[in-house]
Amino acid sequence: MLIIRKAKIQDARLLSQLLETSYRFYFSDLWNNKDELKTYISEESSIENIVASLETPDHHWFIAESHQDINVAATGHDIIPGNIIGFSKIVLNQLIPDKDFTGIYLHKLYLTPHLTGKKYGDQLFDHIVAFGQERGQKWLWLEVLEKNPKAIRFYARKGMEWQKDIIFSSETQQSTMHIMAKNLSLIKME
């Protein structure tokens, strides 16, 4: 069982390391231009941006930890403490594109590299659902890369349904993103 805790300002450096390491591991092959990748990661993982987000009332970051150290050699990432499994970022009350209702926007859900397939993602996702329901959120939605079939299958298995496609554009490429959503008001709270 994971320990899932709400991140604090003091966690900004850890979140920055987790974000940079995880994003590079999972998505660097999808970028045509490595300079654009570097710029994107630099902006997303900047400690200043993370602190600003942590200080924003509707933004919530969660860190998933194990009771014991995971073998660091297995992950290959010695800059991340051995008990860290992953993290997520959500934003409450976000308008779903082309809809007239709001919900939790699941902005990030990343596991430390090489720790997928162990049901950690399920626990973190379920925590987000419960957190949203406790705060009266009726919907959960996210954007997922079309070229990330593993994540799409995971979210579909968790009850997320395709809503529409949007385009993410950088200077040199475009990527299709699926918007997926789940009605939280149909789920009984435990």
What are these regions (language model features)?
Residues 1-3:
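Extreme N-terminal starter segment of soluble prokaryotic enzymes
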Residues 8-11, 148:
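Acidic/polar helix N-cap motif
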Residues 9, 17-32, 36-114, 125-127, ...:
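Acetyl-CoA-dependent GNAT
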Residues 119, 123:
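Short alpha-helical segment within the catalytic ATP-binding CA
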Residues 112-114, 118, 146-147:
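Active-site acidic-Proline motif in GNAT/NAT acetyltransferases
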Residues 118, 135-138:
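Short coil/turn segments at alpha/beta junctions that flank glycine-rich nucleotide-binding fingerprints
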Residues 138, 142-152, 156-158, 163-190:
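C-terminal "cap" of GNAT-fold acetyltransferases
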